[in-house]
A protein has these predicted regions:
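Extracellular/virion structural assembly segments
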Residues: 1-153
């Protein structure tokens, strides 16, 4: 397990530790947490009699959803790896959920965006494992700052 704690939480439910609540999962990486989605509420016009672009911007910035890829390793014997892989899938397959950790203090609001499939079995020394790169969409369009408990700040 990593020295940091990684959490996920479905709306209206208690937070769960990603690495321990489903079985034996090891966090590998999470890509896309720093991505900011394209701004949606901007309108521009060009006119032939002007060198300047006319711009309208909404008061509050709204963004398009961004992609996040969460990569995890599932360890244990073959049956345990399969059960852990399925338990996590059953948790995230339907509905929206939050992800955050106590390393970056960034929180994302996510849905499962694409197929969820494991890698071929691999070995680290004598330890068998499978990995999965899980494609997610951040519905906020950017991550928000949070504390260790996941409360937005």
């Amino acid at each position: 397990m990593s020295e940091y704690t990684h959490y996920i939480q479905k709306e209206g439910e208690e937070k769960v530790n990603l690495e321990t609540n489903f079985g034996r999962i090891l966090y590998s990486k999470c890509e896309g947490l720093d991505t900011k989605g394209k701004r949606k509420n901007v309108y521009t016009e060009t006119y032939s009699d002007s060198d300047n672009l006319r711009v309208w911007q909404g008061e509050d910035v709204t963004r398009e959803a961004t992609k996040i890829t969460l990569t995890l390793a599932f360890i244990g014997d073959r049956a345990e790896r399969a059960a852990t892989f399925d338990a996590l899938y059953n948790y995230i397959k339907n509905g929206k959920f939050y992800y955050w950790d106590n390393a970056r203090h960034k929180k994302a609001y996510l849905i499962l965006a694409d197929e969820y499939k494991p890698s071929e079995e691999a070995f680290y020394g004598s330890q068998p494992y499978i990995t999965a790169s899980i494609p997610l969409q951040n519905l906020w369009g950017e991550c928000k700052k949070c504390n260790d408990n996941g409360n937005l700040i």
